[in-house]
Amino acid sequence: MALVLGSLLLLGLCGNSFSGGQPSSTDAPKAWNYELPATNYETQDSHKAGPIGILFELVHIFLYVVQPRDFPEDTLRKFLQKAYESKIDYDKPETVILGLKIVYYEAGIILCCVLGLLFIILMPLVGYFFCMCRCCNKCGGEMHQRQKENGPFLRKCFAISLLVICIIISIGIFYGFVANHQVRTRIKRSRKLADSNFKDLRTLLNETPEQIKYILAQYNTTKDKAFTDLNSINSVLGGGILDRLRPNIIPVLDEIKSMATAIKETKEALENMNSTLKSLHQQSTQLSSSLTSVKTSLRSSLNDPLCLVHPSSETCNSIRLSLSQLNSNPELRQLPPVDAELDNVNNVLRTDLDGLVQQGYQSLNDIPDRVQRQTTTVVAGIKRVLNSIGSDIDNVTQRLPIQDILSAFSVYVNNTESYIHRNLPTLEEYDSYWWLGGLVICSLLTLIVIFYYLGLLCGVCGYDRHATPTTRGCVSNTGGVFLMVGVGLSFLFCWILMIIVVLTFVFGANVEKLICEPYTSKELFRVLDTPYLLNEDWEYYLSGKLFNKSKMKLTFEQVYSDCKKNRGTYGTLHLQNSFNISEHLNINEHTGSISSELESLKVNLNIFLLGAAGRKNLQDFAACGIDRMNYDSYLAQTGKSPAGVNLLSFAYDLEAKANSLPPGNLRNSLKRDAQTIKTIHQQRVLPIEQSLSTLYQSVKILQRTGNGLLERVTRILASLDFAQNFITNNTSSVIIEETKKYGRTIIGYFEHYLQWIEFSISEKVASCKPVATALDTAVDVFLCSYIIDPLNLFWFGIGKATVFLLPALIFAVKLAKYYRRMDSEDVYDDVETIPMKNMENGNNGYHKDHVYGIHNPVMTSPSQH
């Protein structure tokens, strides 16, 4: 029933499902950012047996030994084909061959069944004749025991052998109890397992409409992204055009701007230089006049009579000789002015080159705004197309017959659930009968083995090696009786147990080998996929059932595998044959509509970097003459002292010499002149030095600017021509390329979205994984794990225990002779004939007819018995 139920679940979905088309791959492109919300199912994908799985594997190994051959796909196909025939001719060679193949495959199972049947037939017969034989005082029925030299050894061997066999039987009984309990507990889980599967199936039914709504909702996300780019066409398209033009234009404008800055710096440097030269001319004249005055004063002071007297005369002569150093630098007054160059630069600055450059920058930066102004109409048209695409997609999804599919499948699920819930109590009732029957069987075996254990226990504990067979104690005798009771029960019930073992073995082994194992390896599906097997008119049953196109390859194995991979129903069942979503979505048609609108997008840009006035301005600056100035002459003067000597040192030296003179007018006059020289240094020399420093800085600026000025301007003008030519010749192609790129971006959103719709409907929507899980639950879990595995473990354990009852009863019969109290025993009158064992035990032979009050009717020698 479980197998039929699982198959109906799968075929029910197949027979009532029609959906969209299948993409070329089951893997979504990495560029897609859409993802359907994950659906969580309650039923586990796999079933784990737990620790008892070790016992199940032990049974599987035994079955592999009994039936090691591979699954007979061809034989099963031919058998099913024969089964569908209205009349079977058993005399046909192919029928005979098929029968032989079946026998060959089932050889191991048949052999075990034959052995079991022999056991069933022979055990009652053997038991009957054994009983009759015992009643005739044969077969160990005579209560007399011969004394044997190896008797104690045999007793121990029989006891140990029986104990080992009883342990083996106990293990088998344990397997039986465990298997019986597993069936009981697992059947109780069936209701919860069924409810879990039906809950997952209803989750599938409920989630599918939500998935479709989610897919439709993602169009708004896509459209909003496209609208954002359309509303930002100034930054997206205009920015793209600007980024393409910027590398060829900005460097030129930056160079022109730096040149405009250089012109301003040149003007400032020339103005500073011109004013500095005028200041130097005036300051140098004043310095020369001051030095002339101080020299006149010093000469007048040196005319003092004291200078004629030794040693003052030497000091005066020294001072007189140094007066020639008090001169100014006349070359400072000869430096040429820069009025002409300054006038040229001022003429250049009459044209606002910096403003012209800013206009070039502005014309470039205005590209995004100009693009937005010129594309307003086109953007509105594209938005209308995008809105219409949304309506088309909504119409396509509404035409998908998913609601009809879900409604039909929902009815099927409800009917199946009602059927299962209606029959589960019956199943649980039958399970109770099975459990009670298994409990009785295991208890019966337990009773038998308990008698054996009690017999061993009483026999071993009550055995007295000094007692004769006729004088054995009550405990030992009870042990022997227990053993014989076990033997009697074994003969009475073991053949009945073997009947149960054979029947369950044949059923369980064949179901395991022909259903469970091939289901796991999918070989069973390959048999069902055999062309013309299930329907002689259809090559492939599923495609014929669904589409009436039996030539289309749609197999049970492929459908089951796809469902296990959580693939959507549409792609799993190749339902594009009834509703091709690719044709209805028609991605190229929708993207073509967007492309046609984008083709009408035209952008005109007139960019002029620098006019003729700006070019002439640069050329005039290059010809202003600052590159032809003799900067070395200016720099040479800036390195010289304004006076012929360091006036401060001269003043200190003069003051020292004056101090060496005797006090008087000459000394005072020289000190006053020294102070005057210090004042000249402070008021005349230091300002000149400051002016020379300013002149040096201005000269360096002009020298740096004028160095290679003509070449730089020529290079800038060449770059300007190149940039302007690039704008003239390439702007239109740049606009076209960026427009296409912009269009591909807009179209790409919808291509990805439409492809995602196709992929989702084909691979994700209405994932049939719950159906595969339900089939696994019905076959692999319920039938194989809940029923067949415990059933196989049951017959394996009970069969092992039953088989070992045979050697157990043999050893029990042998061993009972050593525990039971005998009616007679061997008597030895001659001590020389007493067995050595008896001598060792201190028994000198039996000389009386009555020993311990027990009549001894047989008084013969051992040879008579």
Curated annotation (Swiss-Prot):
Tissues where the protein occurs: Isoform 1 is selectively expressed on CD34 hematopoietic stem and progenitor cells in adult and fetal bone marrow, fetal liver, cord blood and adult peripheral blood. Isoform 1 is not detected on other blood cells. Isoform 1 is also expressed in a number of non-lymphoid tissues including retina, pancreas, placenta, kidney, liver, lung, brain and heart. Found in saliva within small membrane particles. Isoform 2 is predominantly expressed in fetal liver, skeletal muscle, kidney, and heart as well as adult pancreas, kidney, liver, lung, and placenta.
Compartmental location: Apical cell membrane; Cell projection, Microvillus membrane; Cell projection, Cilium, Photoreceptor outer segment; Endoplasmic reticulum
Protein name listed in UniProt: Prominin-1
Phenotype when changing residue 373 to C: In CORD12, STGD4 and MCDR2; affects the interaction with actin
Result for mutant: residue 225 to Q: Loss of acetylation
Keyword Endoplasmic reticulum: yes
Superkingdom classification of source: Eukaryota
Membrane topology per record: Multi-pass membrane protein
Pfam families tied to this protein: Prominin
Sugar-modified residues: 220, 274, 395, 414, 548, 580, 729-730
GO molecular function (one): cholesterol binding
Extra facts: Is used as marker for hematopoietic stem and progenitor cells (HSPC) for somatic stem cell isolation.
